[in-house]
Each structure stands twice: as structure tokens, then as C-alpha cells.
From Swiss-Prot:
Function: Has antibacterial activity against the Gram-negative bacterium E.coli. No antibacterial activity detected against the Gram-negative bacterium V.vulnificus.
Signal sequence coordinates: 1-18
Localization of this protein: Secreted
Protein known as: Lysozyme 3
Positions of disulphide bridges: C75-C151, C80-C86, C91-C100, C113-C133, C123-C129, C147-C165
UniProt family annotation: Belongs to the glycosyl hydrolase 22 family. Type-I lysozyme subfamily.
Pfam families, alphabetized: Destabilase
Span of domain I-type lysozyme: 68-183
Keyword Magnesium listed: no
Domain of life, per lineage: Eukaryota
Protein's gene: lysoz3
GO term, biological process aspect, one: killing of cells of another organism
GO MF entries: lysozyme activity
Length: 187
């Protein structure tokens, strides 16, 4: 009888709360908003359940600055704007796998950049960590296939992989980055 009671309680809780994936994919935790959200803020619409159950997102996931490296701050800003409006937007299914965070980083890209931070999803949703990953990825692949040190090359590699600057299918992506105010020489 006790087992049946626990099953009913667990089932009711699962139905009441459903999936918290939108919150957890953004690096947050679903909880009642009467609890303190230390070093962060609450965002509605990412958790299922009652009206007072909201996503606690830490400030570290949503603020900070770009990591320094071979890609200029301006170029990082343009790429970030194209990918997410430069917001920690969580993960979305894109071209056969999830892309996450500020720069819409895929898990393979995160491994190639040295796997910074505590996990792929949390790094992608932290501006400093995500931009560190982009910097490391570019440092690793910029010389591949003769790509030049330019914002155009960085953007096209970000979009198309290590030889992305040589693929014509990344020219459209570069147009979007260029429209954000970056030029070929923005580095």
C-alpha cells in the first residue's frame, strides 16, 4: 500500500511539473519563487507547474564580458548577435543536434575548444566561458586550409567548421554577421 501511495505522489509530481528542460538547458533551476535566487534572477515561462514555480538563472550565466584572444571583441559581438541576440537562449535542435547558448555551440565544438567550464550546456550559457570556447576554437583552426585572420574567416569557421571559410555555403552566414556592423577586417 505504501508503494502505491509513493507511486501516486511521484506520478502527480511529474504531471504537475512536467519537463524543466527549458530552464535546465539555460543553466537554471526550477523552484518556487518565494525561495531566494542567489546571485541571479527569476525568469517566467521556462518551468512547468504552478504560477510561482519559475526558473532561477544565476547572473554568471547572463552577464560578463567576452574572453580575449585572436577574435576581436567587435567580431565576437557580431557573431553573438547573429546567433542569439547575444542572450543565453538555452539549447535548440539545429542541423541534427542541439546548439546552445550565446554562440549556439554544439557539443562537438565544445570538445574541440578544450571543454571549458563544468559542462557543455552551462559553458554555452555563460558569456565568458562561451566566448573563451570560441577563442580557443578559432586559435585551433584558423590556420586550417589557409584561412586568414579576419572576422569573415572567424564567422565562417564558427558556422561551417574548421574549413568553413572555404565553403560557399557559409557566405550567407557572413552576410548576417557583416550586417551587424562587422567588416572583413574587424578581426
Amino acid at each position: 500500500m505504501n508503494g502505491l501511495f509513493l507511486f501516486c505522489v511521484a506520478t502527480t509530481a511529474a504531471l504537475a511539473y512536467g519537463s524543466d528542460a527549458p530552464c535546465t538547458n539555460s543553466g537554471g533551476v526550477c523552484q518556487d519563487d518565494h525561495l531566494a535566487c542567489h546571485n541571479g534572477h527569476y525568469q517566467s515561462g521556462l518551468c512547468t507547474g504552478g504560477a510561482h514555480r519559475r526558473c532561477c538563472l544565476t547572473s554568471a550565466s547572463h552577464t560578463g564580458s567576452f574572453s580575449t584572444g585572436i577574435v576581436s571583441q567587435q567580431c565576437l559581438q557580431c557573431i553573438c548577435n547573429v546567433e542569439s541576440g547575444c542572450k543565453a537562449i538555452g539549447c535548440h535542435f539545429d542541423v541534427n543536434s542541439d546548439s546552445c547558448g550565446y554562440f549556439q555551440i554544439k557539443e562537438g565544438y565544445w570538445h574541440d575548444c578544450g571543454s571549458p567550464g563544468s559542462s557543455w550546456r552551462s559553458c554555452a550559457n555563460d558569456l565568458a566561458c562561451a566566448s573563451k570556447c570560441v577563442q580557443a576554437y578559432m586559435s585551433r583552426y584558423i590556420g586550417f586550409s589557409g584561412c586568414s585572420h579576419s572576422c569573415e574567416s572567424y564567422a565562417r569557421i564558427h558556422n561551417g567548421g574548421p574549413a568553413g571559410c572555404k565553403h560557399t555555403n557559409t557566405l550567407g552566414y557572413w552576410s548576417h554577421v557583416h550586417a551587424q556592423g562587422c567588416s572583413h577586417n574587424s578581426k
